[in-house]
A protein has these predicted regions:
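Extracellular beta-sheet-rich ligand-binding/adhesion modules
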Residues: 1-285, 290-299, 303-306, 311-323
Length: 323
């Protein structure tokens, strides 16, 4: 079992042996730990010789940066490159981040389907950038991503991120502890490993902005903001969740929910009250806010519970279109 620990004792260079405990650079199947007591962040030679790691863990209390701030032609080279295609039976295959620096840019170069991705916390970002930013190559496999707390950008600035399932937040516990909270941005370059639409987004708390197509959104709590003219194949909205059809209408780009299953919660078209489409809906209970009456409803809109269990606000003197 090879556990390799970053110290950053002399600089932020990943290829300097003096920056690793006992001078041991990572090797294939190693478990890399970035501890709270590291002297420097990981900020140079970010495309270090690629080895297939089994895990990469940025521990709580690490306050330094990973990667550097850059844009334009230098953007892609500002990320730390990490391959998580290794296997090691002694410890689980895992990416875990709980550092609190104001910038961590990480590029997943390879992965396995068994590698879990967990964001337990982040710092607060600077200069308008989320604290943790993740992108990837076109991957053959990828584990699910769980985000509990912090600021996370998936596929920033339109970059690629291959992942099938994203889980954000956690509900209140039975002991009365409050739910976790995260702020997540899902970019237009996020898609499934097979290059189809993102398969599932499950949200229990926090706020998530979505700029890509999604097969299924399960919204149990927190807020989901659709910020582009994308398509959601199925939206399952439960008590405690708020779904905002927030994108402004643009030519040839009208946000569409192909099937709404309203079990509770609130669907709203208030932030940018422009034309959007709900092709089909099963309405059990909940609230729909469309004060400018800009939603177009398909003819497969069905009350599954009592009509009085669904609260509508279409504004005064409106004509509602069911096509």
């Amino acid at each position: 079992m090879a556990i390799v620990t970053w110290t950053g004792a002399t600089s932020g260079s990943l290829t300097t042996t003096g920056n690793w405990l006992d001078g041991a650079l990572p090797v294939n199947n190693a478990h890399v730990i970035v501890p709270s007591w590291a002297t420097n962040g990981m900020t140079s030679n970010l495309n270090w010789p690629e080895v297939a790691l089994s895990s990469f863990h940025v521990q709580a209390g690490f306050t330094k940066n990973i990667g550097v701030s850059a844009s334009g032609s230098s953007f892609a080279n500002s990320f730390l490159e990490v391959s998580l295609a290794g296997t090691n039976a002694d410890l689980p295959q895992r990416f875990a981040y709980e550092g609190t620096g104001n910038l961590a840019r990480i590029h997943i170069k390879a992965s396995t389907a068994n590698t879990s991705y967990q964001v337990l916390n982040t710092g607060s970002g600077a200069n308008g950038h989320p604290a943790l930013q993740l992108m990837s190559d076109d991957l053959a496999a990828m584990g699910d991503i769980l985000i509990l707390r912090g600021e996370v950008s998936l596929g920033p600035e339109g970059s690629l991120l291959d992942v099938d399932n994203i889980i954000v937040g956690s509900p209140p516990t039975s002991t009365g502890l409050s739910s976790s909270s995260a702020r997540v941005w899902i970019g237009s370059g996020v898609n499934a490993v097979d290059d189809s639409d993102l398969e599932t987004l499950t949200v229990s708390s926090g706020t998530v902005s979505v700029d890509c197509n999604v097969d299924t959104i399960n919204l149990h709590g927190g807020n989901v903001l659709q910020t582009s003219g994308n398509v959601v194949t199925a939206l399952n909205l439960y008590t405690g969740g708020v779904y905002e059809m927030a994108n402004p209408q643009t030519t040839g780009s009208v946000h569409t929910v192909a099937k709404l299953n309203l079990y509770g919660g609130t669907l709203t078209n208030e932030r940018n009250p422009t034309a959007k489409t709900i092709t089909a809906a099963d309405l059990y209970s909940g609230t729909i806010l469309d004060p400018a009456a800009k939603l177009t409803w398909g003819d497969s809109t069905v009350y599954k519970g009592k009509a009085t269990d669904v609260n509508f606000d279409f504004g005064p003197n409106r004509t509602i279109r069911i096509t």
